[in-house]
From Swiss-Prot:
One GO BP: aromatic amino acid family biosynthetic process
Record lineage: Bacteria, Pseudomonadati, Pseudomonadota, Gammaproteobacteria, Legionellales
Gene symbol of the encoding locus: aroB
Record-given protein name: 3-dehydroquinate synthase
InterPro entries hit by this protein: Dehydroquinate_synthase, DHQ_synth_AroB, DHQ_synth_fam, DHQS/DOIS_N, DHQS_C
Binding-site list for Zn(2+): 183, 247, 264
GO molecular function: 3-dehydroquinate synthase activity; metal ion binding; nucleotide binding
Cofactors, names only: Co(2+); Zn(2+); NAD(+)
Binding-site list for NAD(+): 71-76, 104-108, 128-129, 141, 150, 168-171
Length: 359
């Protein structure tokens, strides 16, 4: 299989996204984006058991240190971010490179540590979950959670490279693999109706982890995010806000359930359906398109309803702790069509509460 490459260029700071097989064995590739002789690999307990030793062998001629996080969203906190910084402060200089080996949690906290250590050092994303490969590793958003809300403390800090080894998907549990599909569906809904149709036609092969199809859809999802991030790195124009389709609902669900009870992609799936239903209620999205979204997510075995244990008042209150609030108005991403998302602040509290209570 030929390795595919997607080039990102944010503020004249280009970096590549590589997508292929056996990239964790490619010494030349993995060393190419390290400018000094120090690296720190940050991973979690599960991923480290599979891939840490081979990656350390690539850097055997470097000072190579490691930091292993416990597994789970509940450890994406200031406490563990500070522990990473403390280990860096012991003997790492400004030309060190952090390597995030893992899923979205590892990538987010590693990127935030890299953004803050000595006012910013290099880092490389090596995402090992489908969700991280198509979304979290691309675009430079780094953060940790706070008890009040998800990703409330963070920074924009672009990686030097994103290295996606498709072989890491072989060790990904089925639930996490399917959760990652939610972000691929989101990318299609935002910008590319044809891509959405392709997902409908190829989903059976994708769920069988066919690498040829997976490489193609990961590349297309990465291109969609690349184009948006290139145009609006820090959500100034509103373009990047489109990537939050379903996420205002999703972040509230995650927080209310307790981080880790639902996977992020599972919450995103429910959030996508809520956004589509609200779009239909406001006469933006036709009923057949809404049905197609629900059918595709159901085929993946992802949730299309928010949990019954959460009531409308709780969900609405939690949504206001999200970052998509401006001038005390909630900005939601809605759909005018498959492949056409828009930013809206035209949903007031009364309408939103009625929608959440009655659908």
């Amino acid at each position: 299989m030929k390795t595919e490459r997607v080039n990102v260029n944010v503020n004249n700071q280009p970096y590549p996204i590589y997508i292929g097989e056996n990239l964790l064995q490619d010494k030349s590739l993995l060393q190419r984006h390290v400018k000094g002789r120090q690296v720190m690999i940050v991973s979690n307990e599960t991923i480290a058991a599979f891939y840490l030793d081979p990656l350390k062998a690539i850097y055997q001629d470097f000072q190579c240190d490691t930091f292993i996080l416990p597994d789970g969203e509940q450890y994406k906190t200031l406490e563990y971010w500070e522990r990473i910084l403390h280990k860096l402060a012991c003997n790492h200089h400004r030309d060190t490179t952090l390597i995030a080996l893992g899923g979205g949690v590892v990538g987010d906290i590693t990127g935030f540590a890299a953004a803050c250590y000595q006012r910013g050092v290099d880092f490389i994303q090596v995402p090992t979950t489908l969700l991280a490969q198509v979304d979290a590793s691309i675009g430079g958003k780094t953060a940790v959670n706070h008890p009040v809300g998800k990703n409330l403390i963070g920074a924009f800090h672009q990686p030097k490279a994103v290295i996606i080894d498709l072989n890491t998907l072989n060790t990904l549990p089925e639930r996490e693999f399917k959760a990652g599909m939610a972000e691929i569906v989101k990318a299609a809904l935002i910008k590319d109706e044809k891509f959405f149709t392709d997902l409908e036609n190829k989903m059976s092969d994708l769920l069988q982890r066919n690498f040829i199809f997976l490489q193609a859809v990961i590349k297309r999802a990465a291109e969609i995010k690349r184009d948006i991030v290139n145009a609006d790195e820090k959500e100034r124009s509103g373009e990047r806000a489109l990537l939050n389709l379903g996420h205002t609902f999703a972040h509230a669900i995650e927080r209310l359930l307790g981080y880790g009870q639902w996977l992020h992609g599972e919450a995103v799936s429910a959030g996508l359906v809520l956004a589509a239903q609200l779009s239909h209620r406001k006469n933006l999205l036709d009923f057949e398109s809404l049905q197609r979204i629900c059918r595709l997510l159901t085929q993946i075995s992802l949730p299309i309803h928010f949990p019954k244990s959460i009531n409308a008042d709780e969900l609405l209150s939690a949504m206001y702790m999200d970052k998509k609030v401006a001038n005390e108005r909630l900005h939601l991403i809605l759909l005018e069509d498959l492949g056409h998302a828009v930013v809206s602040d035209q949903v007031d509290d009364r309408e939103l509460k009625s929608f959440l209570e009655n659908g």
